UniProtKB/Swiss-Prot annotation:
Underlying gene: ileS
Organismal lineage: Bacteria, Pseudomonadati, Pseudomonadota, Gammaproteobacteria, Enterobacterales
Residues at which Zn(2+) binds: C901, C904, C921, C924
ATP-binding among keywords: yes
Keywords: Aminoacyl-tRNA synthetase, ATP-binding, Cytoplasm, Ligase, Metal-binding, Nucleotide-binding, Protein biosynthesis, Zinc
Protein name from the UniProt record: Isoleucine--tRNA ligase
Gene Ontology terms: biological process: isoleucyl-tRNA aminoacylation
Binding site for L-isoleucyl-5'-AMP: E561
Note on domains (UniProt): IleRS has two distinct active sites: one for aminoacylation and one for editing. The misactivated valine is translocated from the active site to the editing site, which sterically excludes the correctly activated isoleucine. The single editing site contains two valyl binding pockets, one specific for each substrate (Val-AMP or Val-tRNA(Ile)).
C-alpha cells in the first residue's frame, strides 16, 4: 500500500501550542526594552492626531496590588487601541512622592526629624525612600506588559515638577481663590495634621449618646413664645450629641426656622424639643408622664439665650438649614471650631470660633478645671459626669455608628479649627464654574457625573495647607503682625520656584528671606506649611501635561482611575484646573470598580482572599491577567479568584488555538505571490473574510466605547462559533487534500491570511505578548511590531445582492447545526463512528431546498459527511427526524456507501478506478496526479 501522507498539505508552524506565558513573557519584555519599542511606536505615530491619557500617579509606597494592575492594564488597553485607531497616544507614567505615608515609613526606620537628624536630612531620606519604591513598582508595571516612557516617568518630587506645583499655587492666588481662616478641618491626632477628604475612611465606633438640658436665661420670656404661663421649674432647650468632648467649645444651639417645637412639662422642669421627635425623646429620657404646654416655630426662638451647663456663660439659639428631624431633639449643639456646618452658621451669626483642643488631641490649658491636657476621647466620660453633677444630663446611652477615621492609623479623627490656607469655593465663583465644566466632560460610566456634581455642590472650601516636613512648601511670606500676604507674593513665589527647579524643595527651607526681599525680611516671615499632596497630583495637568514635550501643548483627553477618585484626584484636578485656567483638565473621565473576591468580598489580608498580581504573572502569565481585566465589566465591582482566572486561562487557550490553526495552515503561503483575488475566491472563503470584517467593525466600535468585555465576547464568538465550529472545520478537507497551489487551497489560505492579519491586531491591546508572538510567525513583509500599525484594512465581504450572501450562509450554519445533532445521536447509538461515515438526506421545503441544492456536489463538504442529497419535504422517509429549529427541514441518516479513502477519509464508490492509484478515490487521484479538484462554493 502506497503512503499518501506526503501528498497531504498538513498544518505546520513553529508557533507553540502551549503559551508558557510565565516563562516566555520576560524574554519578550527584554526584547521590547532592548529595541526601545516605546520609542519605535512614538516615531511611527509622529504627526498623527493625539490622544492623551494622563496617568493618575499611584503613591510611591509598597508593592503593587491587584487594583493597581487593573488600573494600569485598562490604561494600556486604551493607549494601544488608540494607536491602532491611528492616534499618537504617548503614555507617561507618574508617581505621587510626597506626603505622610512616606514620612511615617522613614520615621519608623530612622526616627522623627529633629530627634536624630535635621529636617533637611529627613527630607533627603524621604526622597531616597520614594525613589526605591518607584523602582520596585515600575518593574511590576512593566512586567504587566504596559508600554510607556518608563525611563522618564514624572515624579511629583522631580525638581521641575515641584517648582511647577508652586507656580500652580501662584496662579490660583493671582486669580483670587486663596484665603486664610481658622476653619474646622479633618484632623488626625496621631498624624498631628489636617487630612484631605480622600484620606478619611469610615469605621464603626461606639460613642456616648447624650441628651443635655440648656436652661433658659429668661424662662418666662421663652415660655411666652409658646403661649405658656404656668410653668413648673426651669425651662430648658434639649440638645442631643454623640461628641460630649465638643461641649466646652459650644457657643450656640441651632434650631430650624420652619420646624414646630413644643414646650413640654415634666416633673420639676419644662423641656423644648421638636414636635415630631417628642415621643422618641420622652422614651429615651424615660418619661411617661408629660404635658404639652404649647408649640411654636423655631423662628420665634431665634436669639433667645440659654445657659451653658458648665462653662459659666450663656449661648444664643440660632437658625440653620442643617437642622433635621432624622434623629436627636431638633436642637443642635453648635461648636464652630468642631464642625463645618457649625462653622458656617457660627460665621453667619458672628460667633466665636472656639478651639480648645491642641494638635495632639488634648485640651489646651485653661479649657476647664480637670480637663486641661486630657485626650478628648478619654474626656467623654468626665464630661458626662460633669453634666450629671450639674443636673443637666437627661439621658446617656451607648451608640454604635459610622465614624470618620484616619486612612493611615485607622483611629478616630476630630474636626478642629486651626489657622489654615484654603482654596475658596465661592469667593471667585470656583464652585459655579466647576459645576459648569463638569457638564462638558464625558463621564464613563455616566453616573460619575451626578456623583462629582453633588460632591462639588456640597464640598467645603479646600484646606490645602499641611503641617508636614516632606511636601512642597507653600512658599508664602506673611506679615509678622497682620499675617497678610506680601504684596509681591507672585514675584516672590516665582523666585522660589526657580530655586526649587535647581535644588528641589530643600531650597525653600535653606532660603534666607533677605536674599529675595531685602529689608522686608524684618517684617515678613516664611509660612512653614506644606501643600496637601492632593494639590501635588491635582496640579499635574499643569506641572506635567502642559510642559512635557511629547504632549506638545495638548490638554489631557482622559483621566482613568478607581471610583474613589471622584472625591480624590478627579476632584482636586478639576478644582485646580478651573481655578488656574477656568476649565476642566480632561475631556473624558473613566472610572473602574474595586476588585473583590469570587464571593464579592472586599480584598483583605486578614481574610486571606487577596490575589497577588505578581503570583498570577509568575504562574499564568501577564496575558491571562490582562484577559481577566478586559473580560470583566469594570463599571461595577471586579471579581477575581483562582477559579475566575482559570476561566480566563481557558478562554485564552481558545484564542491561542485559533491563532495556531491559522498560522499552521498558512504554511508555504507567500502573500506576495499566492494571494487569490476576491472575485476568484471560493464563496465560503469570502464569507469567512466577511465574518472577520463584521467582527472587526464590532470590535473597533467596542474599543472606541471602552467596552472591553464586549471586545472579548465578540472575539470569543468569532473564534469559537463562526470560525471554530463552522469555517475552520469545513476547510480542513480542502486545505489538507487539495493540490498545494490550487485555487481551491490558495483561496482558503488567502482568507486565513486576511483573518490572521485582522485577529492579531484585535488582540494586541489586550493579549499584547501573544499578539507580538503571533506577529512574528505571520508570512509576508511587515513592520517589526504589531503595535506600530493600525487596524487591518484588507477585509471585504459578500455583497447583499449575491445569491450566496451572509444571510444564505447563516441559514447553512443552522442546517449544519441540525445535521450535527442527528449525527451525534447516531454516534451515541453506535450507528456511525464519525461524521464521514454518514450519508444524509435533507428533506426540505422549496425555499430551503433551493439554498441547499445551489451547493450541488459541495453540500457534503459543508455538512462534513461523505454523501448528501436534498429531497422534497413532503416525501420524507418515516425515520427522518424533524428539525426543532427549522420547521421546513427533516434529516435522515444512513451509513455512507462505498469504502473509506485512506487519503481523504471520505467514503466513496470510485476507489480503484485508476490503476496507478488503485487505493484512493477519484477526487484524490485528481489532486495527487491530475489537474486537481475545482471548488466553487465550499
Amino acid at each position: 500500500m502506497s503512503d499518501y501522507k506526503s501528498t497531504l498539505n498538513l498544518p505546520e508552524t513553529g508557533f507553540p501550542m502551549r503559551g508558557d506565558l510565565a516563562k516566555r513573557e520576560p524574554g519578550m519584555l527584554a526584547r521590547w526594552t532592548d529595541d526601545d519599542l516605546y520609542g519605535i511606536i512614538r516615531a511611527a505615530k509622529k504627526g498623527k492626531k493625539t490622544f492623551i491619557l494622563h496617568d493618575g500617579p499611584p503613591y510611591a509606597n509598597g508593592s503593587i496590588h491587584i487594583g493597581h494592575s487593573v488600573n494600569k492594564i485598562l490604561k494600556d488597553i486604551i493607549v494601544k487601541s488608540k494607536g491602532l485607531a491611528g492616534y499618537d497616544s504617548p503614555y507617561v507614567p507618574g508617581w505621587d512622592c510626597h506626603g505622610l505615608p512616606i514620612e511615617l515609613k522613614v520615621e519608623q526606620e530612622f526616627g522623627k526629624p529633629g530627634e536624630k537628624f535635621t529636617a533637611a536630612e529627613f527630607r533627603a531620606k524621604c526622597r531616597e525612600y520614594a525613589a526605591t519604591q518607584v523602582d520596585g513598582q515600575r518593574k511590576d508595571f512593566i512586567r504587566l506588559g504596559v508600554l510607556g516612557d518608563w525611563s522618564h516617568p514624572y515624579l511629583t518630587m522631580d525638581f521641575n515638577t515641584e517648582a511647577n506645583i508652586i507656580r500652580a499655587l501662584g496662579k490660583i492666588i493671582g486669580n483670587g481663590h486663596l484665603h486664610k481662616g481658622a476653619k474646622p478641618v479633618h484632623w488626625c491626632v496621631d498624624c498631628r495634621s489636617a487630612l484631605a477628604e480622600a484620606e478619611v475612611e469610615y469605621y464603626d465606633k461606639t460613642s456616648p449618646s447624650i441628651d443635655v438640658a440648656f436652661n433658659a436665661v429668661d424662662a418666662a420670656a421663652v415660655a411666652a413664645k409658646f403661649g405658656a404661663q404656668n410653668v413648673n421649674g426651669p425651662v430648658s432647650l434639649v440638645i442631643w450629641t454623640t461628641t460630649p468632648w465638643t461641649l466646652p467649645a459650644n457657643r450656640a444651639i441651632s434650631l430650624h426656622a420652619e420646624i414646630d417645637y413644643v414646650l413640654v412639662q415634666i416633673e420639676g422642669q419644662a423641656l423644648i424639643v421638636a414636635k415630631d421627635l417628642l415621643e422618641s425623646v420622652m422614651k429615651r429620657i424615660n418619661v411617661a408622664d408629660y404635658t404639652v404646654l404649647g408649640e411654636t416655630k423655631g423662628a420665634q426662638l431665634e436669639l433667645m439665650r440659654f445657659t451653658h451647663p458648665f462653662m459659666g456663660f450663656d449661648v444664643p439659639a440660632i437658625l440653620g438649614e442643617h437642622v433635621t428631624l432624622d434623629a436627636g431633639t431638633g436642637a443642635v449643639h453648635t461648636a464652630g471650631g468642631h464642625g463645618p456646618d457649625d462653622y458656617t452658621i457660627s460665621q453667619k451669626y458672628g460667633l466665636e470660633i472656639a478651639n480648645p483642643v491642641g494638635p495632639d488631641g488634648t485640651y489646651l490649658p485653661g479649657t476647664y478645671p480637670g480637663l486641661d491636657g486630657v485626650n478628648v476621647f478619654k474626656a467623654n466620660d468626665q464630661i458626662v459626669e460633669l453634666l450629671r453633677e450639674k443636673g443637666a444630663l437627661l439621658n446617656v446611652a451607648k451608640l454604635l455608628h459610622s465614624y470618620p477615621c484616619c486612612w493611615r492609623h485607622k483611629t478616630p479623627i476630630i474636626f478642629r479649627a486651626t489657622p489654615q490656607w484654603f482654596v475658596s469655593m465661592d469667593q471667585k465663583g470656583l464652585r459655579a464654574q466647576s459645576l459648569k465644566e463638569i457638564k462638558g466632560v464625558q463621564w464613563i460610566p455616566d453616573w460619575g457625573q451626578a456623583r462629582i456634581e453633588s460632591m462639588v455642590a456640597n464640598r467645603p472650601d479646600w484646606c490645602i495647607s499641611r503641617q508636614r516636613t516632606w511636601g512642597v512648601p507653600m512658599s508664602l511670606f506673611v506679615h509678622k503682625e497682620t499675617q497678610e500676604l506680601h504684596p509681591r507674593t507672585l514675584e516672590l513665589m516665582e523666585e522660589v520656584a526657580k530655586r526649587v527647579e535647581q535644588d528641589g524643595i530643600q531650597a525653600w527651607w535653606d532660603l534666607d528671606p533677605r536674599d529675595i526681599m531685602g529689608d522686608d525680611a524684618d517684617v515678613y516671615e516664611k509660612v512653614p506649611d506644606t501643600l496637601d499632596v492632593w494639590f501635588d497630583s491635582g496640579s499635574t495637568h499643569s506641572s506635567v501635561v502642559d510642559v512635557r514635550p511629547e504632549f506638545a501643548g495638548h490638554a489631557a483627553d482622559m483621566y482613568l482611575e478607581g471610583s474613589d477618585q471622584h472625591r480624590g484626584w478627579f476632584m482636586s484636578s478639576l478644582m485646580i484646573s478651573t481655578a488656574m485656567k477656568g476649565k476642566a483638565p480632561y475631556r473624558q473621565v473613566l472610572t473602574h470598580g474595586f476588585t473583590v473576591d469570587g464571593q464579592g468580598r472586599k480584598m483583605s489580608k486578614s481574610i486571606g482572599n487577596t490575589v497577588s498580581p505578581q503570583d498570577v504573572m509568575n504562574k499564568l502569565g501577564a496575558d491571562i491577567l490582562r484577559l481577566w481585566v478586559a473580560s470583566t465589566d469594570y463599571t461595577g465591582e471586579m471579581a477575581v479568584s483562582d477559579e475566575i482566572l482559570k476561566r480566563a486561562a481557558d478562554a485564552y487557550r481558545r484564542i491561542r488555538n485559533t491563532a495556531r490553526f491559522l498560522l499552521a495552515n498558512l504554511n508555504g503561503f507567500d502573500p506576495a505571490k499566492d494571494m487569490v483575488k476576491p472575485e476568484e475566491m471560493v464563496v465560503l472563503d469570502r464569507w469567512a473574510v466577511g465574518c472577520a470584517k463584521a467582527a472587526q467593525d464590532d470590535i473597533v466600535k467596542a474599543y472606541e466605547a471602552y467596552d472591553f468585555h464586549e471586545v472579548v465576547q465578540r472575539l470569543m464568538r468569532f473564534c469559537s462559533i463562526e470560525m471554530g465550529s463552522f469555517y475552520l472545520d469545513i476547510i480542513k478537507d480542502r486545505q489538507y487534500t487539495a493540490k498545494a497551489d490550487s485555487v481551491a487551497r490558495r483561496s482558503c489560505q488567502t482568507a486565513l491570511y486576511h483573518i490572521s492579519e485582522a485577529l492579531v491586531r484585535w488582540i494586541a491591546p489586550i493579549l499584547s505578548f501573544t499578539a507580538d508572538e503571533v506577529w512574528g510567525y505571520l508570512p509576508g513583509e511587515r513592520e517589526k511590531y504589531v503595535f506600530t500599525g493600525e487596524w487591518y484594512d484588507g477585509l471585504f465581504g459578500l455583497a447583499d445582492t449575491e445569491a450566496m450572501n451572509d444571510a444564505y450562509w447563516d441559514a447553512l450554519l443552522k442546517v449544519r447545526g441540525e445535521v450535527n445533532k442527528v449525527i451525534e445521536q447516531a454516534r451515541a447509538d453506535k450507528k456511525v463512528g464519525g461524521s464521514l461515515e454518514a450519508a444524509v438526506t435533507l428533506y426540505a421545503e422549496p425555499e430551503l431546498a433551493a439554498k441547499l441544492t445551489a451547493l450541488g456536489e459541495e453540500l457534503r463538504f459543508v455538512l462534513l459527511t461523505s454523501q448528501a442529497k436534498v429531497e422534497d419535504y413532503a416525501s420524507a422517509a418515516a425515520d427522518a427526524q424533524q428539525s426543532e429549529l427549522l420547521k421546513g427541514l427533516k434529516v435522515a441518516l444512513a451509513k455512507a456507501e462505498g469504502e473509506k479513502c485512506p487519503r481523504c477519509w471520505h467514503y466513496t464508490t470510485d476507489i480503484g478506478k485508476v490503476a496507478e492509484h488503485a487505493e484512493i478515490c477519484g477526487r484524490c487521484v485528481s489532486n495527487v496526479a491530475g489537474d486537481g479538484e475545482k471548488r466553487k462554493f465550499a
